[in-house]
């Protein structure tokens, strides 16, 4: 139940769990103050600036045009608390491998039961008894489950020592992603595998891995060739998708308040146009035209939350709602996260691909998981650097003593 509604067609407002997370941040802040930790990392610095620009754009749009809400940036602030949770998980010696393995097993088991119609699932509209067409596991939607499985795959590809276990986990995660019907998550799954194979091995090892992976991908396609992903993609590569988007641009008119997407309609109801593209296209046209209508929007956006629950295009949404400044700060934040470890490098690749067609940076579970992992690896890297400096200092001291003697 919402304590404060965000309005604008959002599925959730500010709830009790939001207050609990804010309380956790207060304890983290007290810990930092007690230990005199005043220096912030580049990751924190860029995200704080992103929050500031998001707040500024929302304040301007909400006061001048009644679009967006200044409460919306609170949700992004809340996500970042998970960064500090990850920090303390590593500090406390938590086994992140077991946690992610449990997450994979639990979601896979529920997803398989959903696929065969044994159980339903809780999505943004409450409990749904039949989720067999597009499974959601323990998440709020198939798009969330797909990205969560991408992240789990990233971890085990980068960290798991056993090649056999790596590809078993990759295979299981890919099968479940096929059941979700999420095309972006499937594309990300293939991309992170290719990137991992390219960076982590010699040519001979890459060839050996290809001999394992290619048959695995063919097996997945053979057994799930008529899956939801395949069915939804029948008209994806049709040139009519682009033609209709361009033809419809001039017919869309911007208004003072953003209309509901239902009022705007779709590009086409014909079978020759991809259904997902048809729904997204009309939203994207409106978002672009509104963004270009005022010079201030170019820099700080039309206001976070202006486009309601889903624009179905993360990169477009973050550009139009937070402007060029917000986009650049968010990209700089991601680049810093990418440098933390091989796992985070793969996670950022998966995240960026999913952002093409999904407002995934607004997803509670996805952002909390990515930032939790980022905080975990940030602390790990920090400790490793400290140990390296300590060891180097000890070696220098040892050599100096020998020279004196």
Q: Model-derived features: where do they sit?
A:
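N-terminal signal-anchor transmembrane segment
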Residues: 1-34, 54-61, 349-353, 369
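Hydrophobic core segments of transmembrane alpha-helices in multi-pass, intramembrane catalytic enzymes
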Residues: 17-25, 71-84, 143-158, 183-196, ...
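Aromatic-anchored transmembrane helix interface
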Residues: 17-19, 43-55, 63-88, 99, ...
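Hydrophobic, aromatic-rich transmembrane alpha-helices
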Residues: 20-36, 150-159, 286-289, 298, ...
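Hydrophobic transmembrane alpha-helices and their immediate junctions
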Residues: 45-48, 164, 194-210, 315-355, ...
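Alpha-helical transmembrane segments of multi-pass inner-membrane proteins
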Residues: 97-122, 138-199
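A membrane-periplasm/extracellular boundary helix in multi-pass inner-membrane enzymes
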Residues: 109, 115, 200-269, 290-293
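Long extracytoplasmic/lumenal interhelical loops at the membrane interface
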Residues: 121-124, 136, 259-325
């Amino acid at each position: 139940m919402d304590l404060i509604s965000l309005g604008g067609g959002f599925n959730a407002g500010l709830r009790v769990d939001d207050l609990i997370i804010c309380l956790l941040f207060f304890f983290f802040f007290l810990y930092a103050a007690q230990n005199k930790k005043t220096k912030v990392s580049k990751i924190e610095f860029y995200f704080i600036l992103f929050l500031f620009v998001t707040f500024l754009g929302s304040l301007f749009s909400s006061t001048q045009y009644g679009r967006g809400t200044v409460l919306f940036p609170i949700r992004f602030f809340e996500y970042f608390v998970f960064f500090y949770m990850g920090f303390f998980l590593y500090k406390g010696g938590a086994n992140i491998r077991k946690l992610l393995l449990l997450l994979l097993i639990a979601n896979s088991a529920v997803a398989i039961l959903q696929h065969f119609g044994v159980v339903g699932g809780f999505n943004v509209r409450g409990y749904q008894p039949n989720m067999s067409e597009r499974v959601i596991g323990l998440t709020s939607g198939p798009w969330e489950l797909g990205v969560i499985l991408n992240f789990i795959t990233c971890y085990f590809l980068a960290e798991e020592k056993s090649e056999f276990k790596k590809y078993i986990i990759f295979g299981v995660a890919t099968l479940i992603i096929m059941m979700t019907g999420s095309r972006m998550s499937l594309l990300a799954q293939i991309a992170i595998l290719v990137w991992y194979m390219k960076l982590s091995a010699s040519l001979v090892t890459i060839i050996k891995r290809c001999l394992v992976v290619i048959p695995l991908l063919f097996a997945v396609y053979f057994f799930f060739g008529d899956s939801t992903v395949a069915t939804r993609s029948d008209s994806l590569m049709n040139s009519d998708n682009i033609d209709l988007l361009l033809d419809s641009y001039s017919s869309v008119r911007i208004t003072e308040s953003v209309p509901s997407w239902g009022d705007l309609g779709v590009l086409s109801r014909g079978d020759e146009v991809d259904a997902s593209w048809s729904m997204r296209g009309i939203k994207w046209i409106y978002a672009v035209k509104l963004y270009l209508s005022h010079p201030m929007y170019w820099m700080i956006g039309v206001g976070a939350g202006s486009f309601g629950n889903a624009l179905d295009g993360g990169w477009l949404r973050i550009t139009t709602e937070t402007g060029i400044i917000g986009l650049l700060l968010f990209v700089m934040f991601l680049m810093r996260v990418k440098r933390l470890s091989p796992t985070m490098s793969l996670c950022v690749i998966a995240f960026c691909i999913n952002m093409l067609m999904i407002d995934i940076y607004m997803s509670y579970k996805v952002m909390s998981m990515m930032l939790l992992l980022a905080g975990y690896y940030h602390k790990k890297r920090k400790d490793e650097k400290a140990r390296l400096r300590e060891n180097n200092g000890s070696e220098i001291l040892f050599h100096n003593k020998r020279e004196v003697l």
